[in-house]
Amino acid sequence: MGPDMTIFSSKRRDVLKLMAGTALLPLMVAAKPAMAQDVALRAIVISDLHSAYERIGQLLAAVETRIAADKAPHIILLNGDLFEIGNAVAARSASEIEWTFLAALAKLAPTVVNIGNHEPDIDNDLSNFVTRAQALGITVLSNIIDKRSGKPYAAASAQVSVGGRKVVVAGLATNAINTYPKATREMLDIPQPFEWAKANLPGIVKPDATNIVLSHAGVVADRDILPLLPDGTLLVGGHDHLNFVHEQGATRYVHTGSWCTSMTVATIAAPGKAAAIETVTIDRSAPASPALKTLIEQTLEKHLTAEEKAIVGKSAKAMTVDEAGRHVAQLIAAKTGADVGFVGHTSFGAGLPEGDIRRYDFNASLRFDGKLMVAEVDGEALAQILKRCNQDGDIPLAARTGDYLYAMPEKPEVKERYKLVCNDWSATNQKSYFGRSDLAFTEVPDVKLKQTVLGGLS
Protein backbone atom coordinates (compact mmCIF):
# COMPACT_ATOMS: atom_id res chain seq x y z
CA MET A 1 0.00 0.00 0.00
CA GLY A 2 1.07 3.60 -0.46
CA PRO A 3 1.95 5.94 2.42
CA ASP A 4 -0.81 7.41 4.54
CA MET A 5 -2.18 10.51 2.86
CA THR A 6 -4.05 13.51 4.24
CA ILE A 7 -7.73 12.73 4.70
CA PHE A 8 -10.00 15.21 2.95
CA SER A 9 -13.63 15.26 4.02
CA SER A 10 -15.97 15.93 1.12
CA LYS A 11 -19.12 15.44 3.17
CA ARG A 12 -20.30 19.06 2.94
CA ARG A 13 -19.76 19.17 -0.82
CA ASP A 14 -21.51 15.84 -1.31
CA VAL A 15 -24.47 16.79 0.86
CA LEU A 16 -24.91 20.03 -1.08
CA LYS A 17 -24.73 18.08 -4.33
CA LEU A 18 -27.29 15.56 -3.12
CA MET A 19 -29.59 18.36 -1.95
CA ALA A 20 -29.32 20.03 -5.34
CA GLY A 21 -30.22 16.76 -7.08
CA THR A 22 -33.14 16.15 -4.72
CA ALA A 23 -34.81 19.41 -5.69
CA LEU A 24 -35.66 17.93 -9.10
CA LEU A 25 -36.57 14.49 -7.83
CA PRO A 26 -40.38 14.88 -7.47
CA LEU A 27 -40.63 15.86 -11.14
CA MET A 28 -38.48 12.93 -12.23
CA VAL A 29 -40.42 10.41 -10.15
CA ALA A 30 -43.75 11.80 -11.31
CA ALA A 31 -42.75 11.34 -14.93
CA LYS A 32 -42.55 7.54 -14.67
CA PRO A 33 -44.34 6.36 -11.51
CA ALA A 34 -45.19 2.88 -12.78
CA MET A 35 -41.65 2.12 -13.88
CA ALA A 36 -40.16 3.46 -10.67
CA GLN A 37 -42.35 1.19 -8.56
CA ASP A 38 -42.81 -1.92 -10.63
CA VAL A 39 -39.68 -2.48 -12.72
CA ALA A 40 -36.33 -3.61 -11.35
CA LEU A 41 -33.23 -1.54 -11.91
CA ARG A 42 -30.31 -3.18 -13.70
CA ALA A 43 -26.73 -2.10 -13.17
CA ILE A 44 -24.18 -3.21 -15.75
CA VAL A 45 -20.85 -3.32 -13.94
CA ILE A 46 -17.41 -3.35 -15.59
CA SER A 47 -13.95 -2.69 -14.21
CA ASP A 48 -10.23 -2.79 -15.01
CA LEU A 49 -10.58 -2.88 -18.80
CA HIS A 50 -6.93 -1.87 -19.42
CA SER A 51 -7.18 -1.07 -23.14
CA ALA A 52 -7.97 -4.72 -23.94
CA TYR A 53 -8.58 -4.25 -27.66
CA GLU A 54 -8.99 -7.98 -28.28
CA ARG A 55 -12.31 -7.91 -26.38
CA ILE A 56 -13.46 -4.30 -25.89
CA GLY A 57 -15.58 -4.44 -29.06
CA GLN A 58 -17.22 -7.66 -27.89
CA LEU A 59 -17.80 -6.13 -24.45
CA LEU A 60 -19.59 -3.15 -25.97
CA ALA A 61 -21.67 -5.51 -28.13
CA ALA A 62 -22.69 -7.44 -25.00
CA VAL A 63 -23.77 -4.23 -23.25
CA GLU A 64 -25.69 -3.05 -26.32
CA THR A 65 -27.45 -6.41 -26.71
CA ARG A 66 -28.40 -6.59 -23.03
CA ILE A 67 -29.92 -3.11 -22.93
CA ALA A 68 -31.73 -3.47 -26.28
CA ALA A 69 -33.38 -6.74 -25.19
CA ASP A 70 -34.52 -5.52 -21.76
CA LYS A 71 -36.98 -2.72 -21.04
CA ALA A 72 -35.79 -2.34 -17.45
CA PRO A 73 -34.00 0.93 -16.64
CA HIS A 74 -30.21 0.53 -16.75
CA ILE A 75 -27.20 2.27 -15.25
CA ILE A 76 -23.66 1.52 -16.45
CA LEU A 77 -20.90 1.51 -13.83
CA LEU A 78 -17.20 1.54 -14.78
CA ASN A 79 -15.06 1.08 -11.69
CA GLY A 80 -11.74 2.43 -12.93
CA ASP A 81 -8.76 1.49 -15.08
CA LEU A 82 -10.08 2.00 -18.59
CA PHE A 83 -6.57 2.66 -19.93
CA GLU A 84 -3.24 0.79 -20.05
CA ILE A 85 0.02 2.57 -20.90
CA GLY A 86 1.61 -0.84 -21.48
CA ASN A 87 -0.54 -1.12 -24.62
CA ALA A 88 1.68 0.64 -27.15
CA VAL A 89 -1.23 1.16 -29.53
CA ALA A 90 -3.27 2.89 -26.82
CA ALA A 91 -0.38 5.26 -26.17
CA ARG A 92 0.25 6.03 -29.86
CA SER A 93 -3.43 6.54 -30.69
CA ALA A 94 -4.22 8.65 -27.61
CA SER A 95 -6.77 5.97 -26.63
CA GLU A 96 -9.19 6.82 -29.42
CA ILE A 97 -10.78 3.38 -29.05
CA GLU A 98 -11.44 3.82 -25.32
CA TRP A 99 -12.94 7.28 -25.79
CA THR A 100 -15.21 5.97 -28.56
CA PHE A 101 -16.22 3.15 -26.20
CA LEU A 102 -17.08 5.66 -23.45
CA ALA A 103 -19.11 7.80 -25.84
CA ALA A 104 -21.07 4.73 -26.94
CA LEU A 105 -21.82 3.74 -23.33
CA ALA A 106 -23.08 7.23 -22.50
CA LYS A 107 -25.61 6.99 -25.33
CA LEU A 108 -26.95 3.66 -24.06
CA ALA A 109 -27.74 4.52 -20.42
CA PRO A 110 -26.68 6.83 -17.57
CA THR A 111 -22.98 6.04 -17.12
CA VAL A 112 -20.83 6.54 -14.02
CA VAL A 113 -17.03 6.22 -13.94
CA ASN A 114 -15.00 5.96 -10.74
CA ILE A 115 -11.37 6.99 -11.23
CA GLY A 116 -8.78 4.23 -10.81
CA ASN A 117 -5.00 4.33 -10.77
CA HIS A 118 -4.71 3.89 -14.56
CA GLU A 119 -6.98 6.77 -15.64
CA PRO A 120 -3.90 9.05 -15.87
CA ASP A 121 -1.91 6.49 -17.91
CA ILE A 122 -2.19 8.15 -21.33
CA ASP A 123 -2.73 11.77 -20.26
CA ASN A 124 -1.02 12.24 -16.89
CA ASP A 125 -3.27 15.14 -15.88
CA LEU A 126 -6.41 13.58 -14.40
CA SER A 127 -8.33 16.83 -14.74
CA ASN A 128 -8.28 16.37 -18.52
CA PHE A 129 -9.89 12.95 -18.20
CA VAL A 130 -12.62 14.36 -15.95
CA THR A 131 -13.40 17.26 -18.29
CA ARG A 132 -13.53 15.10 -21.40
CA ALA A 133 -15.65 12.36 -19.81
CA GLN A 134 -18.09 14.88 -18.36
CA ALA A 135 -18.44 16.44 -21.82
CA LEU A 136 -19.76 13.07 -23.02
CA GLY A 137 -22.47 13.21 -20.35
CA ILE A 138 -20.70 10.77 -18.04
CA THR A 139 -20.81 11.18 -14.26
CA VAL A 140 -17.23 11.03 -12.97
CA LEU A 141 -16.56 10.24 -9.31
CA SER A 142 -13.37 10.43 -7.26
CA ASN A 143 -12.14 11.12 -3.74
CA ILE A 144 -8.67 12.06 -5.06
CA ILE A 145 -7.56 15.64 -4.36
CA ASP A 146 -5.61 17.68 -6.91
CA LYS A 147 -2.62 18.96 -4.91
CA ARG A 148 -2.24 21.90 -7.28
CA SER A 149 -5.60 23.39 -6.35
CA GLY A 150 -6.43 21.60 -3.10
CA LYS A 151 -9.78 20.66 -4.66
CA PRO A 152 -11.12 17.23 -5.62
CA TYR A 153 -10.79 16.18 -9.25
CA ALA A 154 -14.49 15.30 -9.21
CA ALA A 155 -17.33 14.87 -6.74
CA ALA A 156 -17.02 11.76 -4.58
CA SER A 157 -20.73 10.97 -4.94
CA ALA A 158 -23.71 11.72 -7.12
CA GLN A 159 -27.43 11.12 -7.20
CA VAL A 160 -28.55 9.70 -10.52
CA SER A 161 -32.15 9.25 -11.68
CA VAL A 162 -32.56 5.95 -13.52
CA GLY A 163 -36.05 5.29 -14.83
CA GLY A 164 -37.48 7.36 -11.99
CA ARG A 165 -35.44 5.55 -9.35
CA LYS A 166 -33.14 7.46 -7.03
CA VAL A 167 -29.66 5.96 -7.19
CA VAL A 168 -26.84 7.25 -5.00
CA VAL A 169 -23.36 6.31 -6.19
CA ALA A 170 -20.11 6.99 -4.31
CA GLY A 171 -16.56 6.42 -5.55
CA LEU A 172 -13.19 6.02 -3.88
CA ALA A 173 -9.67 5.24 -5.07
CA THR A 174 -6.69 3.18 -4.00
CA ASN A 175 -4.05 5.11 -2.07
CA ALA A 176 -1.28 2.77 -3.26
CA ILE A 177 0.53 5.70 -4.84
CA ASN A 178 3.20 3.61 -6.58
CA THR A 179 0.51 2.01 -8.76
CA TYR A 180 -0.21 5.39 -10.39
CA PRO A 181 1.93 6.68 -13.28
CA LYS A 182 5.10 8.23 -11.89
CA ALA A 183 4.51 11.52 -13.69
CA THR A 184 1.17 12.05 -11.96
CA ARG A 185 1.97 11.07 -8.35
CA GLU A 186 3.03 14.53 -7.20
CA MET A 187 -0.38 15.89 -8.25
CA LEU A 188 -2.38 13.41 -6.17
CA ASP A 189 -3.49 13.54 -2.55
CA ILE A 190 -5.37 10.32 -1.84
CA PRO A 191 -7.01 9.55 1.52
CA GLN A 192 -6.68 6.20 3.25
CA PRO A 193 -9.78 4.35 1.95
CA PHE A 194 -11.26 3.08 5.23
CA GLU A 195 -10.75 6.39 7.04
CA TRP A 196 -12.32 8.27 4.15
CA ALA A 197 -15.26 5.85 4.01
CA LYS A 198 -15.84 6.07 7.77
CA ALA A 199 -15.87 9.88 7.64
CA ASN A 200 -17.90 10.33 4.47
CA LEU A 201 -20.14 7.40 3.50
CA PRO A 202 -22.65 7.84 6.37
CA GLY A 203 -23.48 11.27 4.96
CA ILE A 204 -23.72 10.03 1.38
CA VAL A 205 -25.89 6.89 1.46
CA LYS A 206 -29.66 7.37 1.73
CA PRO A 207 -32.30 5.03 3.22
CA ASP A 208 -34.78 5.74 0.40
CA ALA A 209 -32.27 5.27 -2.43
CA THR A 210 -30.50 2.42 -4.15
CA ASN A 211 -27.00 2.79 -2.71
CA ILE A 212 -23.97 1.81 -4.77
CA VAL A 213 -20.32 2.24 -3.74
CA LEU A 214 -17.61 1.95 -6.39
CA SER A 215 -14.31 1.17 -4.67
CA HIS A 216 -11.03 0.92 -6.55
CA ALA A 217 -9.22 0.49 -3.24
CA GLY A 218 -8.93 -3.31 -3.40
CA VAL A 219 -10.18 -6.21 -1.31
CA VAL A 220 -8.20 -5.50 1.87
CA ALA A 221 -9.66 -2.00 2.24
CA ASP A 222 -13.12 -3.06 1.08
CA ARG A 223 -13.33 -5.77 3.74
CA ASP A 224 -13.05 -3.04 6.39
CA ILE A 225 -15.52 -0.79 4.58
CA LEU A 226 -18.25 -3.45 4.27
CA PRO A 227 -19.51 -3.15 7.89
CA LEU A 228 -19.97 0.61 7.42
CA LEU A 229 -22.56 0.16 4.68
CA PRO A 230 -26.34 0.00 5.18
CA ASP A 231 -27.81 -3.42 4.44
CA GLY A 232 -28.76 -3.75 0.80
CA THR A 233 -25.85 -1.72 -0.58
CA LEU A 234 -24.13 -2.84 -3.78
CA LEU A 235 -20.36 -2.58 -3.20
CA VAL A 236 -18.35 -2.89 -6.41
CA GLY A 237 -14.67 -3.75 -6.04
CA GLY A 238 -11.80 -3.35 -8.48
CA HIS A 239 -8.04 -2.94 -8.78
CA ASP A 240 -7.19 -6.55 -7.86
CA HIS A 241 -8.49 -8.12 -11.13
CA LEU A 242 -10.74 -10.60 -9.33
CA ASN A 243 -14.10 -12.14 -10.19
CA PHE A 244 -16.36 -13.15 -7.29
CA VAL A 245 -19.54 -12.34 -5.37
CA HIS A 246 -19.69 -12.08 -1.58
CA GLU A 247 -23.06 -11.99 0.20
CA GLN A 248 -23.43 -10.25 3.56
CA GLY A 249 -27.06 -9.90 4.59
CA ALA A 250 -28.75 -8.06 1.72
CA THR A 251 -25.48 -6.37 0.76
CA ARG A 252 -23.64 -7.69 -2.26
CA TYR A 253 -19.90 -7.20 -2.80
CA VAL A 254 -18.85 -7.97 -6.38
CA HIS A 255 -15.66 -8.02 -8.41
CA THR A 256 -16.31 -8.29 -12.11
CA GLY A 257 -13.06 -9.49 -13.64
CA SER A 258 -10.62 -7.56 -15.80
CA TRP A 259 -9.30 -7.10 -19.32
CA CYS A 260 -12.84 -7.07 -20.77
CA THR A 261 -13.23 -10.79 -20.05
CA SER A 262 -16.56 -10.41 -18.22
CA MET A 263 -19.22 -8.04 -16.98
CA THR A 264 -21.67 -8.23 -14.10
CA VAL A 265 -25.39 -7.49 -14.28
CA ALA A 266 -26.92 -6.59 -10.91
CA THR A 267 -30.73 -6.57 -10.74
CA ILE A 268 -32.07 -4.48 -7.86
CA ALA A 269 -35.80 -4.73 -7.15
CA ALA A 270 -36.02 -1.85 -4.67
CA PRO A 271 -33.87 0.21 -2.28
CA GLY A 272 -32.40 -1.99 0.44
CA LYS A 273 -33.17 -5.20 -1.43
CA ALA A 274 -30.40 -7.67 -2.23
CA ALA A 275 -29.15 -7.43 -5.79
CA ALA A 276 -29.41 -10.54 -7.94
CA ILE A 277 -25.99 -10.98 -9.55
CA GLU A 278 -25.28 -12.45 -12.99
CA THR A 279 -21.79 -12.79 -14.45
CA VAL A 280 -21.55 -12.56 -18.24
CA THR A 281 -18.43 -13.95 -19.92
CA ILE A 282 -17.17 -12.00 -22.94
CA ASP A 283 -16.17 -14.28 -25.83
CA ARG A 284 -13.15 -13.02 -27.75
CA SER A 285 -14.42 -14.73 -30.92
CA ALA A 286 -17.88 -13.10 -30.78
CA PRO A 287 -18.75 -10.24 -33.17
CA ALA A 288 -17.55 -6.81 -32.07
CA SER A 289 -19.90 -3.85 -31.87
CA PRO A 290 -20.12 -1.96 -35.19
CA ALA A 291 -19.34 1.17 -33.17
CA LEU A 292 -15.81 -0.18 -32.54
CA LYS A 293 -15.07 -2.99 -35.00
CA THR A 294 -13.63 -0.96 -37.89
CA LEU A 295 -11.96 1.55 -35.59
CA ILE A 296 -10.11 -1.22 -33.73
CA GLU A 297 -8.96 -2.84 -36.98
CA GLN A 298 -7.77 0.46 -38.46
CA THR A 299 -6.07 1.60 -35.25
CA LEU A 300 -4.13 -1.64 -34.89
CA GLU A 301 -3.11 -1.56 -38.55
CA LYS A 302 -1.93 2.04 -38.26
CA HIS A 303 -0.02 1.82 -35.00
CA LEU A 304 1.36 -1.71 -34.63
CA THR A 305 5.04 -1.92 -35.59
CA ALA A 306 6.65 -4.80 -37.45
CA GLU A 307 8.37 -5.81 -34.22
CA GLU A 308 5.04 -5.96 -32.36
CA LYS A 309 3.48 -8.02 -35.15
CA ALA A 310 6.39 -10.48 -35.11
CA ILE A 311 5.65 -14.03 -33.91
CA VAL A 312 7.59 -14.66 -30.70
CA GLY A 313 6.10 -17.96 -29.55
CA LYS A 314 3.41 -20.59 -29.85
CA SER A 315 0.81 -21.93 -27.48
CA ALA A 316 -0.69 -25.40 -27.95
CA LYS A 317 -3.99 -24.09 -26.56
CA ALA A 318 -5.54 -20.82 -25.53
CA MET A 319 -4.75 -19.96 -21.90
CA THR A 320 -6.82 -17.97 -19.45
CA VAL A 321 -4.96 -15.41 -17.37
CA ASP A 322 -4.84 -17.90 -14.47
CA GLU A 323 -3.44 -20.65 -16.68
CA ALA A 324 -0.85 -18.23 -18.07
CA GLY A 325 0.13 -17.18 -14.55
CA ARG A 326 0.71 -20.74 -13.42
CA HIS A 327 2.60 -21.52 -16.62
CA VAL A 328 4.96 -18.59 -16.08
CA ALA A 329 5.55 -19.59 -12.44
CA GLN A 330 6.50 -23.07 -13.67
CA LEU A 331 8.82 -21.65 -16.35
CA ILE A 332 10.81 -19.40 -14.01
CA ALA A 333 11.19 -22.24 -11.50
CA ALA A 334 12.57 -24.52 -14.21
CA LYS A 335 14.91 -21.82 -15.54
CA THR A 336 16.48 -21.10 -12.14
CA GLY A 337 16.39 -24.57 -10.60
CA ALA A 338 13.99 -23.37 -7.92
CA ASP A 339 11.62 -25.68 -6.08
CA VAL A 340 8.70 -23.25 -6.46
CA GLY A 341 8.14 -20.31 -8.80
CA PHE A 342 5.99 -17.30 -7.87
CA VAL A 343 4.66 -14.41 -9.95
CA GLY A 344 2.11 -11.71 -9.12
CA HIS A 345 -1.45 -12.07 -10.41
CA THR A 346 -1.78 -8.49 -11.67
CA SER A 347 1.50 -8.84 -13.56
CA PHE A 348 -0.83 -10.43 -16.13
CA GLY A 349 -3.51 -8.86 -18.26
CA ALA A 350 -4.98 -11.07 -20.93
CA GLY A 351 -4.37 -14.78 -21.27
CA LEU A 352 -2.62 -16.19 -24.34
CA PRO A 353 -4.22 -17.10 -27.68
CA GLU A 354 -3.90 -20.54 -29.26
CA GLY A 355 -1.23 -20.89 -31.91
CA ASP A 356 1.10 -18.10 -32.97
CA ILE A 357 1.72 -15.39 -30.37
CA ARG A 358 2.67 -11.90 -31.56
CA ARG A 359 4.90 -9.76 -29.36
CA TYR A 360 1.90 -7.43 -28.96
CA ASP A 361 -0.22 -10.32 -27.60
CA PHE A 362 2.63 -11.45 -25.35
CA ASN A 363 3.02 -7.97 -23.87
CA ALA A 364 -0.73 -7.82 -23.21
CA SER A 365 -0.51 -11.10 -21.32
CA LEU A 366 2.68 -10.47 -19.32
CA ARG A 367 2.46 -6.74 -18.62
CA PHE A 368 5.74 -6.08 -16.86
CA ASP A 369 9.32 -7.23 -17.25
CA GLY A 370 11.74 -7.41 -14.34
CA LYS A 371 14.53 -9.25 -12.62
CA LEU A 372 14.20 -12.71 -11.11
CA MET A 373 14.89 -12.96 -7.39
CA VAL A 374 15.63 -16.06 -5.31
CA ALA A 375 15.46 -16.88 -1.61
CA GLU A 376 15.53 -19.96 0.64
CA VAL A 377 12.96 -20.97 3.25
CA ASP A 378 12.19 -23.97 5.43
CA GLY A 379 9.16 -26.19 4.98
CA GLU A 380 7.02 -24.44 7.58
CA ALA A 381 7.59 -21.03 6.00
CA LEU A 382 6.78 -22.41 2.54
CA ALA A 383 3.54 -23.97 3.80
CA GLN A 384 2.42 -20.60 5.19
CA ILE A 385 3.33 -18.83 1.94
CA LEU A 386 1.48 -21.35 -0.25
CA LYS A 387 -1.73 -20.83 1.74
CA ARG A 388 -1.82 -17.27 0.34
CA CYS A 389 -1.26 -18.24 -3.30
CA ASN A 390 -3.45 -19.20 -6.28
CA GLN A 391 -6.54 -17.35 -5.08
CA ASP A 392 -8.44 -17.76 -8.35
CA GLY A 393 -10.74 -20.40 -6.83
CA ASP A 394 -13.64 -20.07 -4.39
CA ILE A 395 -11.80 -18.26 -1.59
CA PRO A 396 -13.59 -16.90 1.52
CA LEU A 397 -13.46 -13.10 1.71
CA ALA A 398 -11.59 -13.27 5.03
CA ALA A 399 -8.76 -15.20 3.35
CA ARG A 400 -8.38 -12.93 0.33
CA THR A 401 -5.32 -10.69 0.12
CA GLY A 402 -6.29 -8.66 -2.95
CA ASP A 403 -3.48 -9.18 -5.41
CA TYR A 404 -1.80 -12.54 -4.89
CA LEU A 405 0.88 -14.86 -6.22
CA TYR A 406 0.57 -17.70 -8.68
CA ALA A 407 2.74 -20.53 -7.34
CA MET A 408 3.90 -23.67 -9.13
CA PRO A 409 4.19 -26.47 -8.36
CA GLU A 410 1.43 -26.22 -5.79
CA LYS A 411 2.64 -29.34 -3.94
CA PRO A 412 6.45 -29.53 -4.14
CA GLU A 413 8.22 -32.64 -2.88
CA VAL A 414 8.91 -32.68 0.86
CA LYS A 415 12.39 -31.51 1.93
CA GLU A 416 14.00 -29.41 4.66
CA ARG A 417 14.92 -26.31 2.63
CA TYR A 418 13.34 -24.84 -0.47
CA LYS A 419 14.60 -22.46 -3.12
CA LEU A 420 11.99 -19.90 -4.22
CA VAL A 421 12.06 -17.65 -7.29
CA CYS A 422 9.80 -14.71 -8.09
CA ASN A 423 9.63 -11.50 -10.11
CA ASP A 424 11.28 -8.47 -8.50
CA TRP A 425 8.00 -6.58 -7.85
CA SER A 426 6.80 -9.46 -5.68
CA ALA A 427 10.12 -9.54 -3.81
CA THR A 428 10.12 -5.77 -3.23
CA ASN A 429 6.56 -5.98 -1.90
CA GLN A 430 7.05 -9.27 -0.03
CA LYS A 431 4.90 -8.28 2.94
CA SER A 432 1.84 -7.88 0.69
CA TYR A 433 2.51 -10.95 -1.44
CA PHE A 434 4.33 -13.45 0.75
CA GLY A 435 2.83 -12.22 4.04
CA ARG A 436 6.23 -11.72 5.64
CA SER A 437 9.23 -9.36 5.62
CA ASP A 438 12.06 -11.74 6.50
CA LEU A 439 12.80 -13.26 3.09
CA ALA A 440 16.39 -12.52 2.00
CA PHE A 441 16.12 -12.23 -1.77
CA THR A 442 19.10 -12.06 -4.12
CA GLU A 443 19.05 -11.26 -7.82
CA VAL A 444 19.57 -13.96 -10.44
CA PRO A 445 22.27 -12.45 -12.68
CA ASP A 446 21.67 -11.91 -16.41
CA VAL A 447 18.14 -13.33 -16.40
CA LYS A 448 14.92 -11.37 -16.95
CA LEU A 449 11.30 -12.42 -16.57
CA LYS A 450 10.06 -11.86 -20.13
CA GLN A 451 13.20 -13.35 -21.68
CA THR A 452 12.67 -16.50 -19.60
CA VAL A 453 9.01 -16.83 -20.54
CA LEU A 454 9.66 -16.26 -24.24
CA GLY A 455 12.22 -19.06 -24.10
CA GLY A 456 9.50 -21.36 -22.79
CA LEU A 457 7.04 -20.39 -25.54
CA SER A 458 9.39 -20.83 -28.49
Predicted regions and their residues:
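N-terminal secretory signal peptides and thylakoid transit peptides that target proteins
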Residues: 3-26
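Short, motif-level signal for alpha-helix interfacial/capping segments enriched in acidic residues
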Residues: 25-28, 217-219, 223, 356-357
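A short hydrophobic/aromatic micro-motif that marks alpha-helical segments and, especially, helix-coil
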Residues: 26, 63, 96, 393-394
